[in-house]
């Protein structure tokens, strides 16, 4: 036995042994996909237009505050569409404001200038950058929420420019998961405008700097709205949930109800202390997603940076609220464009049918190869079993998730592996018909079939890579198993079966090849 053959046999034994080690025990090493173990699939679209509008709203509020601090005599700054309109009736104020914009707000460009009006906005490049950043922030925020929700092996990935795909295996409370993921959680602190009665505001007598928001009163049994209270709030946001450091569920022993205690960061605590110190006796509203949760009276300056959000919460609702506040608000609302739920019973049924399909397909192929190619068919069957071992080992090594399309990829891999052996065996038969000896026929058969097998597998591999790059979860699962299967089939068909032939020829010279 020469050194090359020994090296081949050692390599084959090492690869097979390593793959058996990787894939054992199989049920622990290979994770099942959503369609096999049950769970939820969501497709979300991020409203990137609103992300830009929110950015402009924040900039508008900042400019109003800046104008007040600089004592500039100008009109009411407001956003209209994707532009900020700044009325400037006096030439001096206009020049001063333009200098201020260049010095402090260089990210905004002057898009139009009239005698008594300045129009600013973001460039097209900046708008696209804001949109891209919004999707990235939404992706990270949703990941954080899911991590705190406690789902094992979730999939959260971006698709296209604004879509986010989420797969949550094993989730049972679907409604709660959807609420937790899709909630914007925009937390704002605003002062109540007590100079205007709610009746006047509802009748249309509302100052430009104010708006009406409602506090909802929910039925704790049915979780439906039974009443709501209007509040007139200043549009200016004192600060948002960006200043939030922590949010925890606490229990109020006096009323026997849970509430959410929030802790602000250093800058947030400073702002909170300043606002509460300057507005003792006034009401400060805590607004979440456009609804007033509470509007307590400020009794004294609060330097601790601690506040609480109370309401008619159940323990589960308070827990979910603390999760979304800790993970941060979404930079823009998200729309659920697809919501699919697979029950565990259906998933188990898919597993059973998938195993049955692989078993039947494998058995038919094994029988055909032995019946048609006799002893050589038996060698091909050994290579096919090695192929499956390598496939499972590499799936476990790469942490791939096995899906129903992935099982289809395994079945297709069986066909590809057999196809390579069929090409080799037919070439060997051609050489035998020409009168070549078994040894020479085997050498020539493998040599002449190699380029055909390589070309066919490379083209299939290219397609699999494209499917993986541009496909979603199930398609990616198919592409992964197909890619690994192609590589495994080339290894087993070209190297393993030939090494076995060579080993047989070393110990028993063959006059007639069983093929």
UniProtKB/Swiss-Prot annotation:
SUPFAM superfamilies assigned: Multidrug efflux transporter AcrB transmembrane domain (SSF82866)
Q: Which UniProt keywords apply?
A: Cell inner membrane, Cell membrane, Membrane, Protein transport, Translocation, Transmembrane, Transmembrane helix, Transport
Cellular location(s)? Cell inner membrane
What's the main place this protein lives?
membrane
A matching Pfam family: SecD_SecF_C
State a single Gene Ontology molecular function.
protein-transporting ATPase activity
The transmembrane segments are: 5-25, 353-373, 375-395, 398-418, 450-470, 477-497
InterPro entries reported for this sequence: SecD (IPR005791), SecD/SecF_arch_bac (IPR022813), SecD_1st (IPR048631), SecD_SecF_C (IPR048634), SecD_SecF_C_bact (IPR055344), SecDF_P1_head (IPR054384)
> Per the UniProt entry, what is one GO biological process?
protein transport by the Sec complex
Q: Which Gene3D superfamilies match?
A: 3.30.1360.200, 3.30.70.3400, Multidrug efflux transporter AcrB transmembrane domain
Topology in the lipid bilayer: Multi-pass membrane protein
Taken from the UniProt entry, a GO cellular component term is:
plasma membrane
Instruction: Describe its partners and assembly state.
Output: Forms a complex with SecF. Part of the essential Sec protein translocation apparatus which comprises SecA, SecYEG and auxiliary proteins SecDF. Other proteins may also be involved.
**Function (record text):** Part of the Sec protein translocase complex. Interacts with the SecYEG preprotein conducting channel. SecDF uses the proton motive force (PMF) to complete protein translocation after the ATP-dependent function of SecA.
Similarity section = Belongs to the SecD/SecF family. SecD subfamily.
Q: What is this protein's record name? A: Protein translocase subunit SecD
Q: Report the source organism.
A: Desulfurispirillum indicum (strain ATCC BAA-1389 / DSM 22839 / S5)
Gene giving rise to this polypeptide: secD
